[in-house]
Regions:
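Class I S-adenosyl-L-methionine-dependent methyltransferase catalytic core
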Residues: 2-154
Length: 154
C-alpha cells in the first residue's frame, strides 16, 4: 500500500498531515510517522490499543502522532481539522461501513486534492461514489481510493 501511495500520490515528507481512523494497534500510524508525515492523528476506541499506540510513539521518541480515544463516527462529526491523507480500516462487518466516505466528505475532513483510502472486504463496492478513483485488491484485502477533488471529465 505505501509503495502505491508514495509512487502515485504523496511524498510523505512534504508536510503531509494524516488521520488514521479505526487505528487498531497503530501500524498505519507508525508507518506514516516513519515515512515523514508532519502530523498523524490516530483514532481508536479500544483503550488497550490506544495505550499501545502511545507506548510505541514514546519509544520511537516522536511528537508527530496524537492518539485519540474516540468512536470514529463521532470523531468525524466533531473534527474541525482537515487532512492530506485519511486511512480508514473499519471492521469489515461494520454495518455503517458503506457510509464512511460520505461522512468524511460531508464533514470536510480532506484538504483539496486530499486522499482517502478505505480498507474493506470484497463485498463492498464504492465505484458509484462521486469521489471514488480506484480500487486495489491484494488477496482478500480491498482498498478503495477517494479524492476530495475529482477531476472533471473531458
Amino acid at each position: 500500500l505505501f509503495n502505491v501511495l508514495s509512487n502515485n500520490y504523496f511524498d510523505f515528507e512534504d508536510g503531509v498531515t494524516a488521520l488514521d481512523l479505526f487505528a487498531g494497534t497503530g501500524s498505519i500510524s507508525i508507518e506514516l510517522v516513519s515515512r515523514g508525515c508532519d502530523k498523524v492523528i490516530s483514532v481508536e476506541k479500544d483503550p488497550q490499543h490506544l495505550s499501545f499506540i502511545s507506548q510505541v510513539m514514546r519509544e520511537v521518541k516522536t511528537d508527530k502522532c496524537f492518539p485519540v480515544r474516540a468512536d470514529a463516527f463521532k470523531f468525524i462529526e466533531k473534527c474541525s481539522e482537515q487532512f492530506d491523507f485519511i486511512f480508514d480500516d473499519p471492521p469489515y462487518a461494520l454495518k455503517d461501513l458503506q457510509s464512511i466516505p460520505s461522512h468524511i466528505f460531508e464533514n470536510g475532513l480532506l484538504k483539496e486534492n486530499g486522499l482517502l483510502v478505505l480498507e474493506h472486504g470484497k463485498d463492498q463496492n464504492f465505484e458509484d461514489d462521486p469521489h471514488f478513483i480506484e480500487r486495489r485488491i491484494y488477496g482478500s484485502v480491498n482498498f478503495s481510493f477517494f479524492r476530495a477533488t475529482v477531476p472533471e471529465a473531458e
